């Protein structure tokens, strides 16, 4: 037996290659549509799917003429098929998706498993077809099925036919509930995505179901890798001829068992990195995550849980929107990636295997894959808001620490209207705070209550208070008047002390007796009562009898107690009472208040100041004058 072929037309091959898309009704149709063509030299098994089934008749009968036609077309085609554009089917309505939970465990046996007898498998297939009912009612999950067909075709043909199988697989789209309701076209320009080939780069990108995902745990990688197909189409008829290579030899139908997604199975995946299968797998994962409507943590937990059969039956609520989003993302990624991998080159296969492994390991659940999910957009927005708050807090901390004038001024403007910001401070400048708040009427009331001396003192406190007093015209006028009074009083005090100052400046010893001299000084300008030489207040009668009451010596002793160090006593030329005179000025003054003669010591005349004395009269008068205590004065006393 040289070779064996299996012809699967249209949608049945997609249901055959996809694990999670197998359902009970699909399996019944597959069993019913299988026809056996047995020859003596070259046995052949042909399986055909009904030609574009309508909604009313999903399972139409297959005539022998169609079987012969498919076989003849298979022989006429070359072994190296060419890639062609995806045909646009004209059917408007599609039946519900038929899935069957089958897994395709790999058989690692030797060539003995590939050389099984075709007759036994055919008999098993015939018996299986008899037992299956024609209705589409429920099919039990627990039944186990043995391989329908095995073939001994050489493994070299797998490499050439695998890419054609994937192309054929990607060009078909299974029906959904939404398509049946909306009566929408299945194949449109918007649903095409680039898949690299010989003549074109456009094909279906998004299949909107977990059955087309390479990363699904129920998908058999070798089945997807070993499928091959050729498509010939006309106006209304599409014919698919698929050779059965190691596909049947390595696949065993088991409805009760699921294939574990181990590293060994993933390594056997024969798909380049830029093929349609990788895009399907990642699109499926994105759709699965974008369907979630819960929180982000629930989304992560649901993504990590192994998908069950019941979960796969559920369809996305918004299938059309998700399909368009995935298609746009697929086109954007294909435009960015300009590198192409030849499907028949070994090096390209190895690089694609490594790239797909890295993609599954790193991009299994990343933010890039979840860019279409509303939950991730919400999480990213919250993260950016928290980041802005942290940066704002850091900026505020730097703002308080920085001593730049601009930033400090900005802070002062912000805190200017804060009430109670000065609480707890021991010393507070109330006038400055009132001026800062432009409360001039309150400042006017405060300054009006102050005295002129207080205003003068406030002027000298600080520059701010000086500005405050200067702004109030009334208070500033009072301050100026007080300054004028101070100056006038200072000049008057200086005039009063001019007479004593002339003598005091000559002697350094007067500094020690200044307090005593102040007591002897009598203020001028006021009416001083008549005093005796001893300081008693005298009436005019008492003053006339003064000479009679006291002796002249007692008078001299009384006046001598009030003399300064630079003064001396001398009798008055008129009344002979004790008179004080200053030797350096040559001027004398009678101590008796009734006389009070101011005279010149040289000429004994009225004091003439800087003018020259009259010498004659002075000498004559001088000859008569006798110094007290002299011999002449003693003789005069004796004579008296």
UniProtKB/Swiss-Prot annotation:
<dbReference type="InterPro" id="IPR002867">
    <property type="entry name" value="IBR_dom"/>
</dbReference>
<protein>
    <recommendedName>
        <fullName>F-box only protein 43</fullName>
    </recommendedName>
</protein>
<dbReference type="GO" id="GO:0045835">
    <property type="term" value="P:negative regulation of meiotic nuclear division"/>
</dbReference>
<comment type="subunit">
    <text>Part of a SCF (SKP1-cullin-F-box) protein ligase complex. Interaction with SKP1 does not occur. Interacts with ANAPC2; the interaction is direct, ANAPC4, CDC16, CDC23; the interaction is direct, ANAPC10; the interaction is direct and CDC26, during spermatogenesis. Interacts with CDC20.</text>
</comment>
<keyword id="KW-0862">Zinc</keyword>
<feature type="domain" description="F-box">
    <location>
        <begin position="423"/>
        <end position="480"/>
    </location>
</feature>
<feature type="region of interest" description="Disordered">
    <location>
        <begin position="615"/>
        <end position="640"/>
    </location>
</feature>
<keyword id="KW-0597">Phosphoprotein</keyword>
<comment type="function">
    <text>Required to establish and maintain the arrest of oocytes at the second meiotic metaphase until fertilization. Acts by inhibiting the anaphase-promoting complex/cyclosome (APC/C) ubiquitin ligase. Probably recognizes and binds to some phosphorylated proteins and promotes their ubiquitination and degradation. Plays a vital role in modulating the ubiquitilation of CCNB1 and CDK1 during gametogenesis.</text>
</comment>
<keyword id="KW-0863">Zinc-finger</keyword>
<feature type="region of interest" description="Disordered">
    <location>
        <begin position="328"/>
        <end position="354"/>
    </location>
</feature>
<feature type="binding site">
    <location>
        <position position="590"/>
    </location>
    <ligand>
        <name>Zn(2+) 1</name>
    </ligand>
</feature>
<keyword id="KW-0479">Metal-binding</keyword>
<keyword id="KW-0469">Meiosis</keyword>
<dbReference type="GO" id="GO:0042177">
    <property type="term" value="P:negative regulation of protein catabolic process"/>
</dbReference>
<dbReference type="GO" id="GO:0140013">
    <property type="term" value="P:meiotic nuclear division"/>
</dbReference>
<feature type="modified residue" description="Phosphoserine">
    <location>
        <position position="275"/>
    </location>
</feature>
<feature type="modified residue" description="Phosphothreonine">
    <location>
        <position position="176"/>
    </location>
</feature>
<dbReference type="InterPro" id="IPR044064">
    <property type="entry name" value="ZF_ZBR"/>
</dbReference>
<feature type="binding site">
    <location>
        <position position="575"/>
    </location>
    <ligand>
        <name>Zn(2+) 1</name>
    </ligand>
</feature>
<feature type="binding site">
    <location>
        <position position="600"/>
    </location>
    <ligand>
        <name>Zn(2+) 2</name>
    </ligand>
</feature>
<dbReference type="GO" id="GO:0030163">
    <property type="term" value="P:protein catabolic process"/>
</dbReference>
<dbReference type="GO" id="GO:0040020">
    <property type="term" value="P:regulation of meiotic nuclear division"/>
</dbReference>
<dbReference type="GO" id="GO:0010948">
    <property type="term" value="P:negative regulation of cell cycle process"/>
</dbReference>
<comment type="pathway">
    <text>Protein modification; protein ubiquitination.</text>
</comment>
<dbReference type="GO" id="GO:0001674">
    <property type="term" value="C:female germ cell nucleus"/>
</dbReference>
<dbReference type="GO" id="GO:0008270">
    <property type="term" value="F:zinc ion binding"/>
</dbReference>
<feature type="binding site">
    <location>
        <position position="572"/>
    </location>
    <ligand>
        <name>Zn(2+) 1</name>
    </ligand>
</feature>
<feature type="binding site">
    <location>
        <position position="608"/>
    </location>
    <ligand>
        <name>Zn(2+) 2</name>
    </ligand>
</feature>
<dbReference type="GO" id="GO:0016567">
    <property type="term" value="P:protein ubiquitination"/>
</dbReference>
<dbReference type="GO" id="GO:0007088">
    <property type="term" value="P:regulation of mitotic nuclear division"/>
</dbReference>
<feature type="binding site">
    <location>
        <position position="603"/>
    </location>
    <ligand>
        <name>Zn(2+) 2</name>
    </ligand>
</feature>
<feature type="binding site">
    <location>
        <position position="613"/>
    </location>
    <ligand>
        <name>Zn(2+) 2</name>
    </ligand>
</feature>
<dbReference type="InterPro" id="IPR047147">
    <property type="entry name" value="FBX5_43"/>
</dbReference>
<feature type="zinc finger region" description="ZBR-type">
    <location>
        <begin position="568"/>
        <end position="616"/>
    </location>
</feature>
<keyword id="KW-0833">Ubl conjugation pathway</keyword>
<keyword id="KW-0832">Ubl conjugation</keyword>
<feature type="binding site">
    <location>
        <position position="595"/>
    </location>
    <ligand>
        <name>Zn(2+) 1</name>
    </ligand>
</feature>
């Amino acid at each position: 037996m040289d070779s064996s072929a299996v012809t699967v037309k249209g949608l049945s091959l997609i249901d055959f290659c996809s694990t999670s898309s197998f359902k009970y009704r699909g399996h019944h149709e597959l069993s019913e549509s299988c026809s056996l063509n047995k020859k003596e030299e070259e046995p052949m098994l042909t399986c055909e799917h009904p030609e574009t089934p309508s909604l009313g008749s999903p399972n139409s009968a297959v005539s022998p003429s169609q079987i012969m036609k498919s076989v003849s077309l298979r022989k006429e085609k070359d072994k190296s098929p060419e890639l062609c554009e995806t045909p646009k089917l004209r059917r408007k309505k599609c039946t519900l998706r038929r899935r069957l939970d089958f897994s395709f465990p790999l058989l690692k046996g030797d060539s003995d498993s590939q050389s099984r007898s075709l007759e036994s498998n055919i008999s098993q297939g015939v018996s299986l077809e008899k037992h299956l009912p024609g209705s589409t009612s429920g099919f039990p999950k627990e039944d186990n099925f043995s391989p329908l067909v095995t073939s001994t075709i050489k493994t070299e043909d797998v490499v050439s036919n695998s890419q054609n199988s994937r192309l054929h697989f990607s060009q078909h789209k299974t029906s959904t509930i939404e398509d049946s309701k909306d009566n929408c076209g299945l194949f449109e320009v918007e649903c095409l995505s680039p898949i690299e080939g010989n003549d074109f780069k456009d094909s279906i990108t998004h299949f909107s179901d977990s059955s087309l995902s390479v990363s699904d745990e129920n998908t058999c990688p070798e089945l997807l890798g070993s499928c091959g197909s050729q498509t010939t189409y006309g106006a209304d008829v599409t014919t698919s001829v698929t050779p059965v290579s190691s596909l049947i030899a390595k696949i065993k139908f088991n409805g009760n068992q699921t294939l574990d997604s181990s590293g060994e199975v993933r390594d056997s995946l024969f798909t380049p990195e830029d093929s349609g299968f990788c895009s399907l797998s990642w699109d499926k994962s994105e759709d699965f995550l974008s369907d979630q409507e819960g929180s982000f943590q629930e989304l992560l937990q649901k993504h990590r849980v192994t998908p069950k059969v019941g979960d796969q039956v559920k369809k996305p609520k918004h299938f059309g929107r998700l399909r368009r989003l995935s298609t746009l993302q697929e086109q954007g990624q294909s435009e960015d990636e300009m590198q192409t991998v030849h499907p028949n080159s070994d090096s390209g296969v190895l690089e694609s295997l490594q790239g797909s492994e890295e993609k599954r390991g790193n991009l299994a659940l990343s933010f890039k894959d979840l860019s279409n999910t509303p939950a991730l957009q919400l999480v990213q927005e919250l993260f950016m808001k928290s980041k802005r708050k942290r940066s704002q807090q850091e900026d505020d901390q730097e703002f308080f620490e920085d001593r730049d004038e601009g930033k400090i001024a900005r802070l002062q403007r912000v805190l200017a209207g804060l009430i109670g910001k000065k609480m707890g401070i021991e010393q507070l400048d109330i006038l400055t705070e009132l001026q800062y708040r432009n409360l001039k009427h309150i400042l006017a009331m405060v300054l009006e209550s102050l005295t002129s001396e207080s205003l003068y003192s406030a002027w000298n406190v600080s520059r701010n208070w000086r500005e405050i007093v200067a702004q109030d015209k009334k208070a500033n006028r009072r301050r100026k008047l007080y300054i004028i009074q101070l100056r006038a009083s200072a000049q008057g005090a200086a005039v009063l002390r001019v007479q004593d100052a002339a003598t005091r400046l000559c002697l350094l010893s007067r500094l020690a007796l200044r307090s005593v001299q102040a007591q002897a000084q009598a203020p001028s300008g006021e009416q001083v009562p008549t005093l005796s030489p001893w300081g008693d207040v005298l009436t005019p009668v008492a003053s006339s009898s003064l000479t009679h009451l006291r002796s002249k010596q007692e008078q001299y002793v009384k006046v001598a107690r009030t003399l300064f160090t630079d003064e001396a006593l001398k009798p008055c030329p008129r009344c002979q009472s004790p008179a004080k005179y200053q030797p350096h000025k040559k001027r004398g003054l009678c101590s008796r208040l009734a006389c009070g003669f101011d005279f010149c010591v040289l000429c004994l005349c009225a004091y003439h100041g800087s003018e020259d004395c009259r010498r004659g009269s002075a000498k004559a008068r001088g000859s008569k004058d006798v110094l007290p205590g002299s011999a002449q004065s003693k003789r005069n006393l004796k004579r008296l």
